[in-house]
A protein has these predicted regions:
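Rossmann-like NAD(P)H-binding beta-loop-alpha module
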Residues: 143-144, 151-221
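N-terminal glycine-/serine-/threonine-rich beta1-alpha1-beta2 phosphate-ribose binding loop
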Residues: 1-116
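Short gly/pro/ser/thr-enriched loop/turn and capping motifs at secondary-structure boundaries
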Residues: 52-53, 131-140, 157-161, 182-186, ...
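Short, ordered loop/turn segments at secondary-structure junctions
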Residues: 49-51, 105-106, 129-132, 155-156, ...
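A short hydrophobic/small-residue beta-strand
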Residues: 123-125
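Short acidic, glycine/serine/threonine-rich loops at helix termini
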Residues: 58-59, 136-139, 162-165, 180, ...
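C-terminal catalytic/substrate-binding lobe primarily of soluble NAD(P)-dependent oxidoreductases
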Residues: 2-8, 202-449
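Rossmann-fold NAD(P)-binding glycine/threonine-rich loop
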Residues: 104, 109-120, 129-149, 153-156
């Protein structure tokens, strides 16, 4: 990689890569902490509905007050300072900004911002994987047609997994499985923002509950975030979901090749070429030692006896047969390494993972028995969790995407564990996110095309 030298060239030329950030939550704040220190990068503006929170987060990230005191976008461009605003569209329309980072985490907002960014001829880094799971394949197609880059966010696990897959294939290996680790027990699918504290207090040292958004955090616990992220990976790499989605097998870092291989070879997978998320908890509640809860991995196959001998000779974490090996990254640095995506988009016009087809979906699935006329509360809430589902199944059965299961009313009773359908809810067909999703379903009516 030579991104650093390319950034230095832009710095020396007085033409830093110009960035607009929409959404200053945890991911955005982590990006800001490193962006200020990156030569050749200029965050021209930051947009957040809560301007005072945005200013507070900039200060938290180590920015001196004078650095984000620009009175306008024009002033920020000229003074190499940063403008803070509540108007995201102003960033998108600003002719001097090259790259938009969408980090709101709200599917509807992300889709709208992506469409407008593409329309204005700018690259977009989609931190908002929730929006990508709803309509990413169509947004990426529109971006390619417009000659701009739509990309997943480096530092988040999906983009890192895509890099693992690309590395393996570029080296001539067959990819058996790829994914990440998490903390999982089967009953977590029923967790909600009230009882998630039982899990968080047990495993995290939380001294200030006010610093935690329980609904957001619960989306990681109940399996939704895993389904969303593995859907992003499938749609970007050509890997596919298993028929029933993720099974979360327990595994240490050193057992990845043994566990994440096909059942026909003694593993847990339905077939090869799939995504899977390993658990850091055994089914009896014991912690898995040397787990991969914050990391990512890929399992590859040695297709020759010589390659398999090399797996063993160089301790490449092979399975017992020696046929499969694993590579893993123990951590992901979230927004701290997001600058890789920004630089890659602006300087090499290259995505760090981008959808190439509609292979996987995330179906809204009932956490409990739901009653007609209940209002669904979306990701991490009390009503539904997101189950990874093959796109062809979702299309054929009309599943309701998890990202749009927010503030819609049920038309019928739904049993716990049942995947919801479009026909089960009252929705506004003119809503932009709904319209774009429906457009994508029509465009990809034949899966993987």
């Amino acid at each position: 990689m030579n991104l650093h030298s390319l950034l230095l060239e832009r710095e020396v030329a007085g033409r830093p890569v110009t960035v607009g950030l929409i959404g200053v939550g945890k991911f955005g704040t982590m990006f800001l902490s490193q962006a200020r220190l990156t030569k050749g990068l200029h965050v021209v503006a930051v947009a957040d509905l809560n301007v005072e929170r945005a200013r507070s987060q900039l200060a938290t990230a180590g920015w001196p007050n004078e650095q984000f005191a620009a009175a306008s976008l024009d002033n920020a461009m000229k003074a190499r300072a940063t403008y803070v605003t509540a108007d995201a569209e102003a960033l998108i329309q600003c002719p001097g900004i090259e790259v938009i980072v969408e980090a709101t985490g709200i599917p509807e907002a992300g889709i709208v911002h992506a469409l407008k960014t593409i329309e204005h001829g700018k690259h977009i880094v989609m931190v908002n994987v929730e929006a990508d799971a709803v309509a990413g394949p169509l947004l990426a197609r529109k971006a390619r047609a417009a000659g701009v880059v739509y990309r997943l966010a480096w530092g988040d696990q999906p983009a890192l997994i895509c890099e693992h897959v690309d590395w393996a294939r570029a080296a001539g290996f067959k990819v058996i499985a790829a994914g990440k680790g998490t903390r999982y027990e089967p009953h977590y699918h029923r967790s909600n923002p009230d009882n998630v504290w039982d899990i968080l207090d047990k495993y995290l040292n939380i001294t200030d509950r006010n610093s935690i958004n329980p609904k957001m955090f619960n989306s990681f616990v109940d399996g939704t975030k895993s389904g969303i992220e593995m859907t992003a990976v499938c749609n970007a790499t050509g890997l596919v979901p298993q028929t029933e989605g993720l099974s979360f097998p327990p595994a240490t870092r050193f057992e990845l090749a043994e566990v994440c291989k096909p059942k026909s070879a003694g593993g847990t997978l339905e077939k090869d070429g799939v995504t899977e998320v390993t658990s850091s908890v055994y089914r009896d509640g014991r912690d898995v030692p040397h787990h991969l809860a914050l990391g990512t991995y890929v399992v590859i196959e040695g297709e020759t006896e010589y390659a398999r001998r090399c797996f063993s000779e160089y301790a490449m974490l092979p399975d017992r047969s020696g046929r499969y090996a694993a590579l893993y990254r123990p951590i992901h640095m979230i927004g701290l390494e997001l600058g890789i995506s920004v630089a890659s988009a602006a300087l090499r016009k290259e995505p760090t993972g981008a959808p190439t087809g509609f292979r996987s979906d995330v179906a809204a699935t009932a956490k409990r028995d739901l009653k007609a006329r209940e209002i669904l509360d979306g990701e991490g809430g009390f009503c539904v969790w997101g189950k990874q589902t093959p796109a062809e199944v979702s299309l054929a059965q009309g599943h309701l995407p998890l990202g749009l299961a927010q503030n819609v009313k049920l038309k019928r009773d739904v049993r716990e564990g049942e995947r919801l359908k479009w026909s089960d809810v009252e929705y506004d067909p003119n809503d932009t996110a709904v319209r774009v999703r429906r457009e994508m379903e029509a465009a990809f009516a034949r899966p993987n095309v």
